[in-house]
Amino acid sequence: MSKNQYTKTALKEAIAGKLQRHFGREVADASKEQVYEACALVVRDALTEHMIETQNEVEKYGERQVHYLCMEFLVGRSLRNNAYNLGILPELTEALKDMGYEMADIFEEEADPGLGNGGLGRLAACYMDGMATIGVRGTGYSIRYEHGIFKQKIEDGQQVELPDSWLASGDVWHIPAMDDTREVKIGGTVNTYFNDQGKLIVEYHDYTPVLAVPYDMPISGYDTNNIACLRLWEAKSPIALDMKLFSSGEYLKALEKHAMAETISMVLYPEDNHREGQSLRLKQQYFLVSATLQDICAKHKAKYGTLENFAHKHVLHINDTHPTLVIPELMRILMDENDMSWEQAWNITSQSVAYTNHTVMPEALECWPVSLVQELMPRIMQIIYEINERFCKELWNYFPNDFQKISKLAIVSDNTVRMAHLAIAGSFSINGVSALHSEILKDRVFNDFYKIYSSKFCNVTNGIAHRRWLCEANPELAELIESKIGRGYRKHPSELQVLANYGNDKVLLQRLGEIKRDNKQRLANYIKEHNGIEVNMDSIFDVQVKRLHEYKRQMLNILHIISLYHKLKDNPGMDFVPRTFIFGSKAAPGYAVAKKTIRLINSIANMINNDPDIGDKLKVVFIEDYKVSLAEMIMPAAEVSEQISIAGKEASGTGNMKFMMNGALTIGTMDGANVEICEAVGRENIFIFGMETPEAEALAASGNYEPMLIYQNDPVIKRVLDHMINGFGDGVDYTDIANLLLHGGNGGPADRYMSLKDFSSYAIAQERVSEMYRHAENWNYMSLMNIANSGRFASDRSVAEYAQNIWRVKTNFAF
């Protein structure tokens, strides 16, 4: 069906038909969940038609394809997004209204897919939207996690992790493609030899076969028939149930091999602080890349009869180091299964793989024990050894006789496989994700590699799906924008810049404030319902929602909140601009400090929110189970965006862009994409504080940072930390957190991320925020300038830069 065929009447008939055929229900008897699934099936049918058309065009014209591998894709809910992109959201809304349903209620029936955790997965999802919209022939690849990350519950102030059984209603968007099932070999032993004809023979013994079963999720683009596909692999065991064991009552033993195989696609990011967890993570990574490459290579060979032209037709883009095994796996397929020489296989591989780095944190640059890689994928370890040997010989030409340097840069060293080094050696492109981050990679993290391979390094600043995060999440704001500049920005986000011409339009500025208040009210209602907290609608909604990690410095925010509490306790009648501090984040289950920080936030919230001296001047809210659908409500309501990581640690960030696009003002350090946001809006429209990267790095390197001196000399900080040590009236001891700041712990220095050092600068910036907020028209002007300058952070632009500078494929995007 074409867009014009999706009339209200046609949609009503199609939905009713799905209800009858799939559920045996008439409209009047159907549940909301059944109506949601019927709507999803109708929309999916349209997407599937377009996906087949797209695949046929790729087959016909032989265009170069982009294969985007990532361990997570945080796609969010699909029904509204797909209906919007297809241009049928108004008709679908009216059809449901005629059938007795509110569209918002039907949207709520859709579970958030448990396919991602944080910024990495959300970025990947935004890029799939961008690829589809601007005409890139792209496919994403990941794992179909049964339980995703986890469902977060807050009990007694503490995070509790529960399974997220999202597939119960989420698989309606997944189209099984059983014909493309692949077998992945895990473990066992390998015997290699050359036969009489000089052909390399590789024999596998005693391995565990795991079937990779693909499910395809169509990803729509805006106002286009081009569809990107997200292929998700599910692990299944091909081994038949041992009925003899089962019949004899040994049920668990009979199911053991099934369970071992299917555990691979059970959860995202299993804890890796023990060998079993490390083993499962590495199995997941190899499962993803092996299934994906087998699939791509088989289809390519069926079409062309050879893999010799593979690099001309495919780009394998690895999003962070998790899929780096794509390099030795492609070598394995080319040599072992297609009789290529090492040199020919390496030439193809190193022209096919592009690598995006997402971190400067040493612990996040993955390393695996050689023994574990050898145990789980012996042939891959053989190939890695050979890559390493040849790589080290190449390094020797640049650093002759410098054994220490070569050991530092080697792929395999100290019985460890360094995945980032493997990615650098085997990729034709290495990019960072903000201008600052890319410079840090070149100047510090990978400086020696940059000296050798400078032409490989480039930057592509992250971007967000602006239609989802502005047009869909904030329709009132989109309507206001379109009343002034039209709809062109939907496909050409740079047109948002025209809004800067309306800075003197007092009516527009007033309306901007009204829209923000409407969105605040929506969030306030949610907080009242789910947290039981009545927030002050006249307060500043100050928001920090992101993964919980020490470098992101939720702690700095906490310290400031406690200091404000002390001010109000000392002088309850003071002239104080009310604040509502809103947090949302998940802590990795094994990250004790992060989990204790969540408990600390909730202890402080309990103290402040129940203190009659404070009233509605100050509130603290922790929103449970933060996810995409909640972000779509929080971002439009936020007035202050907390982007306060220590300078030099955040690669880019994308939450900062979403807040900016929805008119929130950023308080932040000169870190990640904050630097480019500051350049875009001007220092007068952002609240910058703290050390910049050179100063922070120099202080850390000097070893002269002494937070105890700050504690002793700054009465505000001393009082805050003493309060933390003495507790917040709920019996929970936070001395361990205070000690981390003052004395260090777990082998790390005191206040590793320098929250105490930046505290006074942060507090001054927050005073500026309060002062500016008193002047509504000026605040709304600053908000408008942020919206007007946010177009450069659209994922359409990011994807177009990848396409032009790295993938070398055509798009319909106009810079």
Q: Across the structure, where does each feature detected by a protein language model lie?
A:
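A conserved ligand/cofactor-binding region detector
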Residues: 1-815
